From Swiss-Prot:
GO terms for biological process: defense response to bacterium; killing of cells of another organism. The keyword tRNA processing does not apply. The gene is larA. The linear precursor LarA is probably cleaved by the putative peptidase LarD, generating linear 18-residue Lariatin-A or 20-residue Lariatin-B. These linear peptides are probably cross-linked by LarB. Finally, lariatins A and B may be exported by ABC transporter LarE. Is composed of a ring composed by 8 residues, and a tail of 10 or 12 residues. The peptide is threaded when the C-terminal tail is inserted throught the isopeptide-bonded ring. Residues 1-26 form a propeptide. Keywords: Antibiotic, Antimicrobial, Bacteriocin, Isopeptide bond. The record marks K43, P44 as: Important in resistance to hydrolysis. There is a cross-link at G27-E34 (Isoglutamyl glycine isopeptide (Gly-Glu)). This is Lariatin. It comes from the Bacteria.
Length: 46
């Protein structure tokens, strides 16, 4: 019951780090694709 939200909690920091990395990296498309695939709920706008 509490393990479900736990998954999102440990995934949240990972997504933030990935997004920041993609923004600074030239191959952001690769990281962005992987990042989006990992989290279908969070979708950054254009």
């Amino acid at each position: 019951m509490t393990s479900q939200p736990s998954k999102k909690t440990y995934n949240a920091p990972s997504l933030v780090q990935r997004g920041k990395f993609a923004r600074t990296t030239a191959g952001s498309q690769l990281v962005y694709r992987e990042w989006v695939g990992h989290s279908n709920v969070i979708k950054p706008g254009p």
